[in-house]
Amino acid sequence: DLLSRVLAKLLISAFAPTGIIYLAVDDTLCRKRGLTVYGTGMHHDPLISSRAKPLVSWGHDWVVLTLIVVGPFWSPSKVWSLPIGFRLYRNRQGLTKGKKGRKAKTKRRNPNHRTRPELAVELISLVAGWFPERTFVISAFPLVLGIARSTNPRSPTCSLRYGV
């Protein structure tokens, strides 16, 4: 969190020193090989999936909070999304069906396990706590918006929108 805080303060002071801070949050799959890589698992892969056939890939699933920069001086006609916070999503292993179709033994839910939307709300709350006097407009996937509205991020001036 220290790296994220330093990066957020640096980027926000450079690109949004006053006014509204525009943020976006989403998750991304980074494919990795090897069973010994920490934090990897089988995750839904939207790039190779279709509506008819959902597919999965082995890798890291990162939840990333980004600062939206519209028309910076080096690229006035573009919109940039600069990462300022991140969390590694780790799925619950062992609760899926095996090759023979038998349901795995259900384990107790790990109280430390957090879903992607919970991680996104955690990132939003963290950044809102660093800049309590600022107003945020956050673009996120719908489930994050529902959780964020029910848990109220720290900043009372936080507007949530779906899509950019």
Can you annotate each of these PLM segments?
Residues 1-164:
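Conserved, well-structured functional cores that handle cations and Mg-NTP chemistry
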